[in-house]
């Protein structure tokens, strides 16, 4: 695992600031990847490969990057916005990182190994019925069977899952990449699909800041920013941390997410002096035994769902975050769906 993590770290650095030698080696592979990805999409759109339509509208929220765009908080915000407008929303996802391959409809006893960390986090944050499966259509059928009153499904990270038909496509794109001219497809770059793909989606959500002035992939462009909530104790979420008491304590921050620097920066921006940071691979397994010794250990919400109740020590705290999307993305989705007939 450590060697794989180091190699992946090198590749990610290359994606952000390309190394000429690596680009020379990887560029031909990116060309091959582009042809395969284009053919796959064309086959589904032309009907050469079959896709399935669910009996309720499907809104796909995904990205053309290989992770790290800040999508999960945006999905949570969209689902919450739809719920506030009276819509019974369900969520489907692949459930990356879980131990089982079977379709799983989440319940109060579900764990990260059953559902994956991100779907479990979405389920707990929104309360929306949620199902996971490698086949999104199969997950959708199972979800509707368990919750027949669902009126709309949000598919988390399914933009390239063309086996499931969709009524609205939303792509999340990081603001840091909106002005770049050196983006490339995998493996030379971080893109799953070319930038032109953004011209065919219904909306683009620029995450983490404002877009470059020349970035106009869609007439329907939204912006999102992350707001940190109040840090709470993992063993007792109703207990809020008084950050002033950390002044003379040893604080360690631990994150198993795609862009851990964002999390560490958020803590520092809150005035917390972090003595040590621990960056783990995205979706990494983590338990109480893996946590460093410190007066206070602060972790992400995504990592927090991996802990079973009652097995963690009292020095572990969680920083919750939420996405603020402007203008109103949920209202846009409902307006878009007014002209979409219900599947039969």
From Swiss-Prot:
It comes from the Bacteria. GO terms for biological process: lipid A biosynthetic process; lipopolysaccharide core region biosynthetic process. It catalyses: a lipid A disaccharide + ATP = a lipid IVA + ADP + H(+). GO terms for cellular component: plasma membrane. ATP binds at residues 65-72. One of its GO terms (molecular function) is ATP binding. The keyword Transferase applies. Pfam families: LpxK. Keywords: ATP-binding, Kinase, Lipid A biosynthesis, Lipid biosynthesis, Lipid metabolism, Nucleotide-binding, Transferase. Pathway: Glycolipid biosynthesis; lipid IV(A) biosynthesis; lipid IV(A) from (3R)-3-hydroxytetradecanoyl-[acyl-carrier-protein] and UDP-N-acetyl-alpha-D-glucosamine: step 6/6. It is an enzyme of class 2 (transferase). InterPro entries: LpxK (IPR003758), P-loop_NTPase (IPR027417). Its EC number is 2.7.1.130. PANTHER family: TETRAACYLDISACCHARIDE 4'-KINASE, TETRAACYLDISACCHARIDE 4'-KINASE, MITOCHONDRIAL-RELATED. Transfers the gamma-phosphate of ATP to the 4'-position of a tetraacyldisaccharide 1-phosphate intermediate (termed DS-1-P) to form tetraacyldisaccharide 1,4'-bis-phosphate (lipid IVA). Belongs to the LpxK family. This is Tetraacyldisaccharide 4'-kinase. The gene is lpxK.
């Amino acid at each position: 695992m450590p060697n794989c993590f180091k190699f992946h770290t090198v590749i990610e650095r290359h994606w952000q600031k390309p190394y000429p030698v690596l680009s020379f080696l990887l560029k031909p592979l990116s060309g091959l990847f582009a042809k395969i990805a284009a053919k796959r999409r064309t086959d589904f759109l032309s009907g050469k490969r079959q896709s399935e339509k669910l009996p309720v509208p499907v809104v796909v929220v995904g990205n053309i990057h290989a992770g790290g765009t800040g999508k999960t908080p945006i999905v949570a915000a969209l689902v919450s916005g739809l719920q506030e407008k009276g819509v019974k929303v369900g969520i489907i996802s692949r459930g990356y990182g879980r131990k089982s391959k079977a379709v799983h409809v989440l319940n109060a006893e579900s764990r990260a190994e059953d559902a994956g960390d991100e779907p479990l986090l979405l389920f707990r944050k929104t309360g929306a019925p949620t199902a996971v499966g490698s086949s999104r259509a199969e997950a959708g059928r199972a979800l509707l069977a368990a919750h027949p009153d669902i009126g709309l499904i949000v598919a988390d990270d399914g933009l390239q899952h063309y086996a499931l038909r969709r009524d609205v496509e939303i792509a999340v794109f990081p603001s840091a990449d909106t002005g770049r001219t050196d983006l490339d497809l995998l493996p030379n770059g971080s893109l799953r699909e070319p930038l032109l793909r953004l011209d065919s989606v219904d909306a683009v959500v620029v995450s983490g800041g404002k877009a470059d002035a020349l970035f106009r992939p869609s007439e329907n462009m939204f912006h999102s920013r992350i707001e940190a909530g109040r840090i709470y104790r993992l063993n007792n979420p109703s207990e809020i941390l008084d950050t002033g008491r950390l002044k003379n304590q040893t604080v360690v921050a631990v994150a198993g997410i795609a862009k851990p620097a964002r999390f560490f920066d958020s803590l520092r921006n809150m005035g917390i002096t972090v003595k040590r940071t621990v960056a783990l691979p995205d979706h990494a397994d983590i338990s109480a035994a893996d946590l460093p010794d410190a007066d206070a250990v602060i972790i992400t919400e995504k990592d927090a769902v991996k802990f079973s109740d009652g097995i963690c020590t009292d020095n572990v705290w969680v920083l919750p975050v939420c996405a603020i999307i402007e203008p109103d993305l949920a209202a846009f989705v409902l307006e878009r769906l007014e002209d979409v007939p219900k599947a039969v």
